[in-house]
Amino acid sequence: METKKGSLDWKNLQYDLQPWIKEAIASLGFPTMTPVQAATIPLLSGNKDVVVEAVTGSGKTLAFAIPVLQKVSNRLYDSQEEGEAPEKVKQGHMLAIVLSPTRELASQIQSVFNNVIEYLPEDKIPIKTQLLVGSLSTVRDDLDRFLKDKPHILIATPGRMLDFMSSQYVKMNSVEIAILDEADKLLDFSFEKDVVNILKRLPKQRRTGLFSATISAAGNTIFRAGMNNPVKVAVKSKSTTANSAPSALHISYLMIEPEKKITTLIKLLHDYRYKKCIVYFPTCTSVKHFYSIFQKIVNGNDNTESFKFYSLHGQLATKPRLRTLQSFTDGDVALNKHILMTTDVAARGIDIPDVDLVIQLDPPTDPDVFLHRCGRTGRANKVGRAIVMLNDGSRELDYVDFMEVKGVAMQEMPTPDLNQSDHQQFQDKLRKYMLDDRARHEIAIKSYVGFVRYYTKHMATSIFRYQTLDYLGIAKMYGLLRLPKMPESKYIPNDNMPDDGWLGEPIDMDKYSYADNQQEASRLENLNAEKIKKIADAKRRKELKVKNEAWSSKTETKETKQERREKMKRKREAIEKQIMEESSDDEETKVDWKDIVKSNKKKKANSGSMQGSFDDL
């Protein structure tokens, strides 16, 4: 939709908003609309379903928050006759729902709604919101609060919303508008079933809005959202017709050896001027691993400037996650450089002020997430810088062309001048850090294995080929002392494979201890039990050997007897042959020697019989 510069003034909005909403917008400091707001608010506030695709940081949240509040206000305040009390919403009913793929984004959306609602006049019925996300509270607690507070707007993640709706006390008949934020994610295989089931239970006459920076990735699944003749609103960057990123966002890539990624990251964090930075890691374990390393090594260096690190990942419970995000948002930029170390849990929709720099240690497995990550900076026309590290010596350079086809242009940045002695010094500190606690090395191994699994799940398999991955470089980056046994190790060339997998000086693993006394005591107990078992196994093997030797001797005795039998047989055959040779040459009178023996015995018997007869006389 084309919009002239003058038309972005709120006075020129082609829809008459509630007076209190106009005052709230002015008080919040929004002098003009963004293009996506100018195009979307009139449509969604009226009777149109919308599919909105706009670059990150373009004001999408306010573009649907205002229409939602407008519809709720119309329902609460315009339905009353003069002098009559306003019509209240029935028990167990709500007027609007907003679905979000993550808890953090849902919490942030609620904050946007509440910021506007603060300016609601006191003589009006209070508009209430409720957050429904997993782990923050039980479904039962959510239901009790819902029935007690009677909120008008529910902001939820799909799973918790579906569980909440299963209660007989929850009625969906009054819902007038439904919003799907980050709709491409909500309509992919991980959420689609839950989202479709939720939308099926809503009134057919409701209004529906789908919002995302990459809505086209959802394809035909958007038609399963139950919309009626939706209007598509697409707002692109003016910098280039093919660029999906905002013009104020500069995206660069850096070709670097895997082993030097962390030292390069540290140098970037030192050298760049920024207030807040988000660093994306591939897995939850890697966030925990490197967060601990940076706290101990980087912040422990007296020569460094002051850094404030935060850890945020999907394995954290909901309350710590929201608390961490709030602490990072509220961080005083005058005192420290603030660095959030996170996964894709903070890739979508999160709007944090003063984020000037985004660094990706590795590209995401889903190319659509790449732009969402980068979009955490360069928001609301503010200049932002995003950097992605690509593994040198691989085909990952093709990722640049791959993303350009998808409308994301990147520029190569020169490799930072990294002092080899500084790199070696960090590696020495990292090794000492590992040797101080066996538990650290176990986390390092989990991080390394998790990264390998992560790498094999890349959608662009022709670019990210795990057969050619620099496994040794990655292992050194994670600080491993020794390579773990895993199938992928077969891709390491034999010439490069270290002896017995050791990446440095071998150590005695039996003496490699935990820093935690309880863990170490348990390890020693298991080690002692294992030694006892080994001794018992050795004794049992020795007994079996003796038993096997006795059986072997018995076998030899049997073999000796067999040899004697065969010797006797040969001797007997020789006697037979001799007798045959001594027999008469007359072939007709040849007599078998056995017959002769029998005959002689018979004669003796007969003679004995006759002697006996004569004796009787």
From Swiss-Prot:
The keyword Nucleotide-binding applies. It catalyses: ATP + H2O = ADP + phosphate + H(+). ATP binds at A54, V55, T56, G57, S58, G59, K60, T61. Its main location: nucleus. Residues 515-585 form a coiled coil. It holds the Pfam family DEAD. Residues 261-421 form the Helicase C-terminal domain. It comes from the Eukaryota. Disulfide bonds: none annotated. Residues 41-233 form the Helicase ATP-binding domain. Keywords: ATP-binding, Coiled coil, Helicase, Hydrolase, Nucleotide-binding, Nucleus, Ribosome biogenesis, RNA-binding, rRNA processing. The Q motif is unique to and characteristic of the DEAD box family of RNA helicases and controls ATP binding and hydrolysis. This is ATP-dependent rRNA helicase SPB4. It comes from Scheffersomyces stipitis (strain ATCC 58785 / CBS 6054 / NBRC 10063 / NRRL Y-11545). The gene is SPB4.
